[in-house]
């Protein structure tokens, strides 16, 4: 029922056709299925989340060479913007355990997402910069989510989840 509003009638189209003028590519399939021309065909400031593991749908370096305005994330730790469940699961469970929740509901997951998003915009502490051999990480194209080794995650995400669990 909820998916019907996103359905389109007509002929089947290729991934290449679907990406033309697209704002976002969200890949969760297999590596190597997106090429530089497909990224070039996207709308201005495209978002490419190539999350297939171990190899993304398009390699980070290829996407960045395709166009300078791309906002890119992968599931890999060797590139900026690693999208990985390690940012959520430990702290969602910590928050749930802290209040003895017997289930993890949508509100708790949404609270975790909002906490992670808020933390991403905060000034990055020196300990995180040092852990990643960086000088000054900050919110932007190469830092859209916190780094997995950010020690603040537990203090932001777990309490938000716990609060959502008891409300």
Give residue spans per PLM region:
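Rossmann-fold NAD(P) dinucleotide-binding segment
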Residues: 19-48
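Aromatic-residue hotspot detector
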Residues: 5-8, 25, 49, 89-93
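Adenosine-phosphate binding glycine-rich loop
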Residues: 50-158, 162-165
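Short, flexible, glycine/charge-rich loop motifs used to bind or transfer phosphoryl groups or to couple energy/partner
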Residues: 14-16, 38-39, 61-62
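Glycine-rich, charged/polar anion/phosphate-binding loops
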Residues: 10-13, 32-35, 58, 74-75
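Glycine-rich phosphate/diphosphate-binding loop of Rossmann-like nucleotide-binding domains
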Residues: 1-30
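Short glycine/serine/threonine-rich phosphate/pyrophosphate-binding segments
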Residues: 1, 32-37, 56-59, 82-83
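Short secondary-structure boundary/capping segments
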Residues: 2-3, 34, 46, 64-67
């Amino acid at each position: 029922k909820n998916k019907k509003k996103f359905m389109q009638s007509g002929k089947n189209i290729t991934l290449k056709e679907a990406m033309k003028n697209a704002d976002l590519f969200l890949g969760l399939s297999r590596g190597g299925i997106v090429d530089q021309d497909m990224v070039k065909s996207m709308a201005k400031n495209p978002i490419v989340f190539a999350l297939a593991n171990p190899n993304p749908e398009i390699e980070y370096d290829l996407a960045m060479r395709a166009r300078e305005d791309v906002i890119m994330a992968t599931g890999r730790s060797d590139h900026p913007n690693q999208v990985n469940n390690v940012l959520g699961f430990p702290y969602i469970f910590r928050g749930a355990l802290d209040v003895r929740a017997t289930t993890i509901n949508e509100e708790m997951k949404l609270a975790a997402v909002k906490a992670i998003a808020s933390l991403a915009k905060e000034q990055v502490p020196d300990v995180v910069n040092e852990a990643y051999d960086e000088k000054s990480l900050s919110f932007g194209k190469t830092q859209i989510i916190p780094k997995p080794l950010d020690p603040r995650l537990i203090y932001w995400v777990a309490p938000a989840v716990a609060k959502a669990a008891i409300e």
